[in-house]
């Protein structure tokens, strides 16, 4: 079992840090947040003016780039979190700055290729966004962990609040000021140069000024795997379950607003008679106002969480942000300065939730696995970002530019209801921030609600917008709805396929009871995907469908995969396992490997040349299938990777 979360490590008090080192930490956090914010804020303008992406594809392509960057970042940054417990935080921070420097250098190359060849430079831009996201997120995560190492329960809200303050200052206020250069000749080039210079400066400052304070935790064969320890902490503490559910929606706040508010301004710029560079600068100003709200609210929330329950703080901050998002979704014109009011609400809510999550995670984490716990929180937030940005991109193109904000608002309301349910059932903190009872909570309701949310939101939004009022979704939205449902089916297939390797790597056997639930959601979204194609796209016209399949043979691959998935779904119950027999059931369900391969090929052939997302999904399938094949041949992947 993990050691006590507050076991003191010698020489790790806040007083052991000189004021100069604290200033360096805050400065580096500002630099890391600035690099991340600039790469996101400039993206819509580059895709529109440099790479020539068509207006009707802007939402999906912007979302795809962010999704690819987040998927790669989840893997890399999560691994760095585990590694930092063994080799220290400072080395990983320096590595993060180096990765960002490489990404910034590639971005300048992609700019020149884009100017010369248009969309041909998009591949390099994908690489740029991946490297900058991995580098900047690594820096911010490890700096938070370093402050967690040196803080105590008494001063943690203040220190974490200061860190969040500087991160928001760099990611919103400072980024908003820098983005004003976009409206001037040569301004875009200067903006793209700044992450390169900032990364080099951050690397030098890290090497010369930072030092680790927590002793490295060398790996031992007798120790429980860190991920298993993380799971133990989360499952034994309902506050952490709430915190991770909130992180799913909170980390995406700035990304969603920076990306889709900028896209919204650009998409209507011609209608209101302004240039697209001016629209980008205007969006940056509004995001800067959001950042100002966060900065002003951090001290207030810091005081609140010192005196009140963290569960109450999460619920209150999430509900405020949710109302702000829903209000923002009701505006028709992003250039109406009244949109600042809901943005201020989102900013205040984001500040409370983010600070509370940081403090609660460090409070509940045993010191030896603090890096792994913070990394797990990043993993959940990254998965949320992937799912929300992916959905937001489709909604932006199919249902309008305000749709992503409604998505965020409804998701936050869902977690708010979960917080209210905990409080209503007597799960709360004492005055010194310890749980009043040792009651544990099953994850199944939360997993079910989260997995069902994309479909519920799609149906609800379609009804609100009137797409179903006349019995038809209309020609334009059908393609997006069909693709959206197919993406979710494939996403849940991959998650289901990945759960057994994760279970074997971590030793967390309880994951098995969620695997079939995830698999059934994959089948559900696959059914919706097929129905959308058959009923909405072709209105049950078999002749036209056959002609379409002849022209686009990849559809046949999808239908074969769906046919193979049907018996797996109908034999998933425990009663069917007993009826069929365990060995025959396992042999039948090994068809999931073929299904994933077929769907990956179907996805690649269906995608356009501007979309790199299918290749990332396919790479994930290849890695997982390689793992299963190696295990089937008698190899020990875990021992080969030195993680089992």
From Swiss-Prot:
Q: What ranges does the record give for the region Ferric reductase-like domain, renumbered to this chain?
A: 488-599
Localization annotation: Magnetosome membrane
Matching PROSITE patterns: MFS
Q: Name one GO molecular function term.
A: oxidoreductase activity, acting on diphenols and related substances as donors
- Name its GO BP terms in alphabetical order: iron ion transport; protein repair
Q: Which Pfam families match?
A: Ferric_reduct, MFS_1
Q: Which UniProt keywords apply?
A: Biomineralization, Ion transport, Iron, Iron transport, Magnetosome, Membrane, Transmembrane, Transmembrane helix, Transport
Q: Which InterPro entries match?
A: Fe3_Rdtase_TM_dom (IPR013130), MFS (IPR011701), MFS_dom (IPR020846), MFS_trans_sf (IPR036259), MsrQ-like (IPR022837)
Which parts of the sequence are annotated with region: Major facilitator domain?
1-427
Q: Where are the transmembrane segments?
A: 22-42, 63-83, 92-112, 113-133, 159-179, 185-205, 254-274, 281-301, 311-331, 337-357, 369-389, 403-423, 440-460, 478-498, 518-538, 553-573, 588-608, 612-629
Task: State the SUPFAM superfamilies in the record.
Answer: MFS general substrate transporter (SSF103473)
Give a yes or no for keyword Lipid metabolism in this entry: no
The answer on whether this UniProt entry bears the keyword tRNA-binding reads no
The membrane topology term of the UniProt record is:
Multi-pass membrane protein
Q: Which GO terms describe its cellular component?
A: magnetosome membrane; plasma membrane
Query: Which HAMAP family does the UniProt entry name for this protein?
Result: MsrQ
Q: What does this protein do?
A: Required for correct biomineralization of the magnetosome; probably converts and then transports some form of iron. It is partially functionally redundant with MamH. May function with MamX, MamY amd Mms6.
Q: Which family does it belong to?
A: In the N-terminal section; belongs to the major facilitator superfamily.
- Miscellaneous remark of the record: This bacteria makes up to 20 cubo-octahedral magnetosomes of about 45 nm in diameter which contain membrane-bound crystals of magnetite (Fe(3)O(4)).
Name recorded for this polypeptide: Magnetosome protein MamZ
Source organism of the structure: Paramagnetospirillum magneticum (strain ATCC 700264 / AMB-1) (Magnetospirillum magneticum)
Task: Tell me the name of the encoding gene.
Answer: mamZ
């Amino acid at each position: 079992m993990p050691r006590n979360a507050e076991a003191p490590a010698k020489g790790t008090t806040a007083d052991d840090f000189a004021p100069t080192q604290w200033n360096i930490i805050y400065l580096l956090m500002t630099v890391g947040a600035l690099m991340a914010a600039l790469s996101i804020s400039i993206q819509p303008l580059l895709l529109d003016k440099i790479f020539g992406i068509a207006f009707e594809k802007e939402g999906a392509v912007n979302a795809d780039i962010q999704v690819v960057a987040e998927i790669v970042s989840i893997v890399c940054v999560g691994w760095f979190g585990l590694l930092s417990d063994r080799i220290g935080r400072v080395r990983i921070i320096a590595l993060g700055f180096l990765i960002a420097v490489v990404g910034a250098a590639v971005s300048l190359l992609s700019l020149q290729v884009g100017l010369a060849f248009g969309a041909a430079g998009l591949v390099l831009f994908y690489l740029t966004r991946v490297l900058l996201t991995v580098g900047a997120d690594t820096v911010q995560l490890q700096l938070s962990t370093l402050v967690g190492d040196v803080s105590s329960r008494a001063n943690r809200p203040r220190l974490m609040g200061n860190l969040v303050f500087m991160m928001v200052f760099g990611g919103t206020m400072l980024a908003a000021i820098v983005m004003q250069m976009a409206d001037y000749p040569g301004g875009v080039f200067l903006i793209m140069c700044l992450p390169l210079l900032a990364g080099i400066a951050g690397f030098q400052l890290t090497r010369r000024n930072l030092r680790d304070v927590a002793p490295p935790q060398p790996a031992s064969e007798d120790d429980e795997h860190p991920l298993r320890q993380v799971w133990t902490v989360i499952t034994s503490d309902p506050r952490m379950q709430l915190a991770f559910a909130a992180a799913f929606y909170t980390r995406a706040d700035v990304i969603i607003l920076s990306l889709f508010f900028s896209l919204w301004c650009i998409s209507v710029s011609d209608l209101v008679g302004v240039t697209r560079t001016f629209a980008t600068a205007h969006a940056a100003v509004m995001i800067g106002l959001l950042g100002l709200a966060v900065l002003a609210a951090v001290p207030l929330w810091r005081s609140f969480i010192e005196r009140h329950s963290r569960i109450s703080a999460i619920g209150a901050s999430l509900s405020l942000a949710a109302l702000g998002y829903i209000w923002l979704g009701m505006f028709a014109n992003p250039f109406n300065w009244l949109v600042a009011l809901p943005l201020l609400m989102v900013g205040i809510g984001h500040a409370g939730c983010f600070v509370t999550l940081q403090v609660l995670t460090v409070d509940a984490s045993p010191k030896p696995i603090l890096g792994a716990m913070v990394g797990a929180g990043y993993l959940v937030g990254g998965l949320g970002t992937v799912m929300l940005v992916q959905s937001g991109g489709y909604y932006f193109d199919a249902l309008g530019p305000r749709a992503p904000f409604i998505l965020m608002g409804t998701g936050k309301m869902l977690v708010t209801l979960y917080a209210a349910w905990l409080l209503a059932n007597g799960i709360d903190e004492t005055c010194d921030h310890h749980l009043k009872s040792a009651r544990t909570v099953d994850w199944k309701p939360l997993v079910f609600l989260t997995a069902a949310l994309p479909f519920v939101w799609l149906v609800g939004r379609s009804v609100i917008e009137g797409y179903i009022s006349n019995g038809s979704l209309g020609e334009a939205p059908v393609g997006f709805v069909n693709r959206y449902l197919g993406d979710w089916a494939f996403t849940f297939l991959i998650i289901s396929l990945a759960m057994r390797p994760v279970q074997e790597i971590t030793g967390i056997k309880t994951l098995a009871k969620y695997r079939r639930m995830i698999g059934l959601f994959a089948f559900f979204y696959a059914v919706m995907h097929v129905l959308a194609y058959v009923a909405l796209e072709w209105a049950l016209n078999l002749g036209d469908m056959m002609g379409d399949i002849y022209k686009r043979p990849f559809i046949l691959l999808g239908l074969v995969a769906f046919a193979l998935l049907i018996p797996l779904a109908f034999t998933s119950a425990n009663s069917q396992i007993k009826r069929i027999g365990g060995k025959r059931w396992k042999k039948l369900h090994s068809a999931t490997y073929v299904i994933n391969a077929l769907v990956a090929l179907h996805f690649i052939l269906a995608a356009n040349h501007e979309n790199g997302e299918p290749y990332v999904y396919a790479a994930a399938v290849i890695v997982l299938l390689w793992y299963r094949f190696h295990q089937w041949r008698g190899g020990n992947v875990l021992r080969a990777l030195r993680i089992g």
